[in-house]
A protein has these predicted regions:
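Long terminal segments
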Residues: 2-8, 12-47, 53-55, 61-64, ...
């Protein structure tokens, strides 16, 4: 289940982009697709979730699994704060420990600066969700 949520929320990063987007892992393998209507698909185009324009992330059954607030606060489905996204791309957990980084070019890095994915043309805040729901 945790792996499912990780993939779902990583894919949700791109959901509100103008057109469908591909999400890639560190080796540039496609791990999913996002349609312009907010439908999230895995690499085989199977629907695994949805994203609403208000930042609510849902699984394929429309159960809410998380929220991204406008101020950068990240919450789980029960609205418990699980972390923070700083404007410079630094991702912090609820205890303010660094979890990772999102670069302006779409590169996603872990806390040790190892590349773990690529999300071109996607807002940094959405890319940062990966760290909270994996």
């Amino acid at each position: 289940m945790r792996r499912f949520l990780t993939l779902l929320l990583f894919l949700a990063l791109a959901a509100l982009s103008a057109s469908a987007q591909m999400v890639q892992d560190a080796s540039y393998r496609v791990v999913g697709h996002i349609k312009s209507d907010g439908t999230i698909q895995d690499a085989s185009y199977r629907v695994i979730g949805h994203i609403a324009s208000n930042g609510t992330i849902q699984d394929a059954s429309y159960r809410t699994v998380g929220h991204l607030e406008r101020n950068g606060t990240v919450e789980d489905a029960s609205y418990r704060i699980v972390g923070h996204i700083k404007p410079d791309g630094v991702i912090l957990d609820s205890s303010y420990r660094i979890l990772g980084h999102v670069k302006t070019d779409g590169t996603v890095q872990d806390a040790s600066y190892r590349v773990i994915g690529h999300v071109k043309g996607i807002p940094m805040e959405w890319a940062a969700l990966y760290f909270f729901f994996r």
